[in-house]
């Protein structure tokens, strides 16, 4: 697998055309104008050294998007791109148009387009979005959205900031399996319809999000499930651990004609209690000025991890116990006693 590099002013599409499946294309920071990209092979496209801004001054030649991606069976990753201003005559100009395979988006910022992400159907396909921002997308007609996902196998949205769609939905997915976790989904300044719309049902988990429905919403329901007919096979639907704020006088939490969801551990403000919910006594502060949970919105390279600290030195070995004192030298043997003199012999004296 090779790494190809595109410098500011060079053609990104030329690098895509030259890449083999599995290659990575490093795009240097800068503004790339009217570079409309088509990706039909398994590659990774990533920003290096700062933000990569894709801007248009003319309508996309294919009438679709700034980036058109997809073919059945391919895997594409796009990391660190900022795309805005895409418009086409039919009103569906998207930052990125998905047409099949597996698509992974991370650290991207798609804003002020007619569509943020527009996804076609692929029964075996998947889309995963992490640490990204979708803002103020939509053409005002009501049929465009911040995120639209067609009939695919799986859709995952995590740790992202989705807000202020222009009339359409913040997130709409027809995927058979949906996981929407750890996001901020707000409509404080826009006129969106549903915050989350899963029109064909399926298996879905909505957990750990902060969701706000603004006062100018076009639809009172915050979450909708199966409203267009539960054509997807699964019916497991869980909503847990979310903070949900309603600023609309007629707002409602859930439109769900298709199944009985599992509701647990949600905190709500401006809504009646539904299931296992906690009513908040006051409106929570929903400050979005510091989105620290998005590691690098718009493509800034993530900070390097802190250096691994050196392990502390091993303690010195314990001192050995003192040696016992040496044995004293043996005492010299006592002196031999002097020899006993032999007895004196006396002669026999006669008379």
Task: Label each residue range with its predicted role.
Residues 60-61, 69, 229-230, 275, ...:
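Extracellular, surface-exposed repeat architectures
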Residues 270-280:
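Active-site and glycan-interaction determinants of carbohydrate-active enzymes
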Residues 1-18, 29-31:
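Right-handed parallel beta-helix/beta-solenoid
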Residues 58-69, 89-97, 112-121, 140-151, ...:
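Extracellular beta-strand/beta-solenoid scaffold signature
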Residues 23-27, 209-211:
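Extracellular beta-strand repeat scaffolds in secreted/surface proteins
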Residues 13, 17-20, 32-46, 53-79, ...:
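Extracellular beta-strand-rich solenoid/capping regions of secreted or surface-exposed proteins
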Residues 42, 46-52, 73-85, 102-112, ...:
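Right-handed parallel beta-helix
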């Amino acid at each position: 697998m090779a790494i190809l590099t595109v410098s500011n002013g060079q053609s990104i599409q030329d690098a895509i055309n030259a890449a083999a499946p599995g290659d990575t294309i490093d795009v240097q920071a800068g503004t790339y104008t009217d570079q409309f990209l088509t990706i039909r092979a398994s590659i990774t496209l990533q920003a290096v050294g700062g933000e990569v801004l894709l801007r248009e001054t003319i309508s996309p030649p294919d009438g679709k998007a700034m980036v058109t991606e997809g073919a059945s069976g391919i895997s594409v990753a796009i990391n660190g791109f900022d795309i805005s201003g895409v418009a086409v005559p039919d009103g569906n100009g998207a930052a990125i148009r998905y047409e099949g395979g597996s698509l992974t988006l991370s650290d991207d910022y798609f804003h002020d387009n007619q569509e943020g992400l527009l996804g076609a159907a692929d029964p075996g396909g998947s889309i995963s979005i992490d640490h990204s921002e979708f803002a103020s997308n939509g053409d005002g007609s009501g049929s465009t959205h911040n995120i639209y996902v067609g009939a695919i196998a799986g859709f995952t949205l995590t740790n992202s900031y989705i807000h202020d769609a222009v009339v359409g939905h913040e997130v709409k997915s027809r995927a058979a399996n949906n996981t929407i976790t750890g996001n901020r989904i707000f409509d404080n300044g826009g006129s969106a319809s549903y915050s989350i719309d899963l029109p064909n049902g399926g298996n879905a988990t909505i957990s750990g999000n902060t969701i706000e429905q603004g006062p100018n919403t076009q639809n009172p329901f915050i979450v909708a499930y199966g409203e267009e007919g539960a054509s997807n096979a699964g019916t497991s639907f869980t909503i847990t651990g979310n903070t949900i704020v309603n600023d609309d006088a007629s707002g409602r939490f859930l439109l769900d004609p298709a199944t009985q969801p599992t509701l647990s551990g949600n905190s709500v403000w401006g809504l009646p209690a539904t299931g296992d919910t906690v009513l908040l006594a006051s409106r929570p502060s929903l400050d979005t000025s510091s989105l620290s949970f998005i590691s690098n919105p718009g493509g800034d390279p993530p900070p390097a991890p802190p250096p691994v600290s050196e392990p502390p030195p091993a303690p010195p070995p314990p001192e050995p116990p003192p040696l016992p004192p040496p044995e004293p030298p043996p005492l010299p043997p006592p002196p031999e006693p002097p020899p006993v003199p032999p007895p004196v012999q006396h002669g026999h004296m006669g008379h």
